[in-house]
């Protein structure tokens, strides 16, 4: 993958990038680098979401769960991983818990 900056001709003062081709693009996503997220980790995380959807329903988790309950499960999975248990993807389940807490910080801040 080529460095994205080599395509940028100049930075426009109105929050746009202007490319050598003349194309313009807003800079509103410049602080978020989704291209840096590991595709391997993301696949593992998606499998945890799929497993949960099969067991509890597609969006059951979005109804909300107490943070201490999520942390307890995440810590349990982390400890199992530390003990060498590879019977399930414990690290992806820890990541799921952290993603859920971050989601609830925005959607259910009083939990």
What positions do the PLM features span?
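Intrinsically disordered, low-complexity regulatory regions
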Residues: 1-111
